[in-house]
Amino acid sequence: MIMKSRRLLAVLAACTAVTFTGCGVVTVVPIGEEASYTGKQEFDSAAESEGDWSSVVADISQKAQDLVELLNGDGITETTAVKGTGKIKEYNTDTPKHYLVVELDGFTGTKEIRVRTDGPNSSTAIRDLQSLKNFESFTNQTEWSSYGKELNKQALAQVIDPLEIDESVVGKTVTFTGGAEAGADAVTITAVELTIE
């Protein structure tokens, strides 16, 4: 009987050993270090947009058309790279999306011309106008969208914030280059270059 018990224990031990060896070895990977194990880097939209910024500005500036000529001609029907100069009539802070209202030199139309200056910016004008990268440059829509948002943050940090815009800009001359989007009553520009004198 003791021999049978020992044999039974030996068989159970062997079965247990076989069962556990089928599980393999599990490696616990610390959070944030996945790339060192998989070789796949996590997408960093902030770093990507910051690294691309100067090239994006040059790209859009090269494509920019005179806004007055466009508006006095056939108008704007899609997002367009533009440049222009005008007098600041108003600094609107009534909504979280602050903007300058600009009277363009030579513009004969009735649409209000706005240059974004602050607040949340959901525009995709900069992302859509630059030709460094396109949707296929990214893994998915989330990365493409995130890249666009980070380009807007670069515009705010690199172009708008250094100007410290306040009510004192009213009456001054603004020169801009950026992406224009036309609505029913207004043309709104997200600037990649902006000077106020």
State where each predicted segment sits:
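Bacterial N-terminal signal peptides
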Residues: 12-20
